């Protein structure tokens, strides 16, 4: 009898542990479009690297990956954060046809991570929702999209920078983002000074404009990765303009920073050394 009771107690405790783990698991939904090719805007494979790293981290993540907006009406049930890595602009492949659902998830406190071209939507309702979701976005005739080498000489103390050292990365770093007024709720994470050569292009929706020239002339540092905490604790967001080149996922500091950002937007306590991961790309780390 005593032995039977002991076994029952062990079984009960074991089930409780597993139930607790399952209940506490954080659900991350990754959305991508077809992108461009294997080397640039490789959204599907980029998401796959991040999703696998989260699953393998043993931190209690449950992930789902979709190409395009999910047709399954239950895809977002219980979601803690949504990662969007896709082409953007007026025909944003994921947001523009789903603004109502996007707004509902913001209202529900779901976290959001937008990367590279995915940070661009048209000014108006879509832009306003991006400000609510993650505190900033690429606005035509305000922001620009040149290629340049960003030198992140220092990083702020923040859960997203846990285990991340200053680094240099060549990328298509859009800058001069449209942020919340007075940067309210926004914490710059990646900031750098673009070279003056990024101002050599003629004026256009993405290339140059009087606003960015004024900012550059004033010597203002440009924030190209940022965290956002919504008012009244109603969710978190993160945006970054990097991610053009697929090879950059081989860089530990970049990969760790994005994994940390996903975890943070999902409400996970980021480990002091960052979310662990092993690079899966068989390529040389870019200089």
For the regions a protein language model found, what residue spans apply to each?
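Catalytic beta-strand/loop cores that center a nucleophilic Ser/Cys/Thr
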Residues: 140, 144-233
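Bacterial N-terminal signal peptides that target proteins for export
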Residues: 1-10
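Extracytoplasmic/secreted proteins, especially bacterial periplasmic and envelope-associated proteins
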Residues: 45, 49, 78, 97, ...
């Amino acid at each position: 009898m005593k032995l039977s009771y002991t076994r029952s107690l062990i079984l009960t405790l074991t089930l409780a542990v597993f139930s607790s783990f399952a209940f506490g698991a954080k659900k991350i939904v990754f959305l991508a479009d077809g992108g461009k090719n294997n080397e640039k805007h490789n959204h599907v494979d980029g998401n796959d690297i991040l999703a696998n790293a989260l699953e393998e981290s043993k931190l209690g993540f449950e992930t789902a990956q979709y190409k395009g907006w999910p047709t399954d009406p239950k895809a977002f049930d219980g979601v803690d954060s949504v990662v969007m890595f896709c082409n953007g602009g007026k025909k944003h492949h994921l947001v523009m046809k789903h603004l109502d659902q996007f707004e509902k998830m913001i209202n529900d406190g779901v976290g959001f991570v937008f990367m590279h071209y995915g940070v661009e939507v048209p000014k108006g309702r879509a832009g306003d929702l991006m400000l609510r979701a993650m505190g900033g976005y690429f606005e035509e005739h305000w922001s620009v999209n040149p290629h340049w080498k960003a030198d992140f000489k220092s990083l702020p103390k923040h859960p997203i920078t846990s285990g991340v050292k200053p680094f240099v990365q060549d990328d298509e770093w859009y800058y001069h983002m449209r942020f919340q007024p007075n940067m309210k709720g926004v914490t710059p994470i990646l900031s750098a000074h673009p070279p003056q050569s990024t101002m050599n292009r003629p004026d256009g929706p993405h290339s140059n404009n009087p606003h960015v020239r004024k900012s550059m002339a004033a010597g203002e540092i440009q924030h190209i990765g940022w965290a956002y905490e919504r008012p009244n604790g109603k969710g978190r967001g993160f945006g970054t303009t990097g991610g053009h080149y697929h090879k950059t996922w081989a860089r530990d500091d970049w990969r760790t920073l994005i994994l940390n950002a996903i975890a943070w937007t999902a409400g996970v306590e980021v480990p002091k050394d960052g979310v662990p991961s092993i690079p899966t790309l068989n390529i040389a780390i870019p200089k």
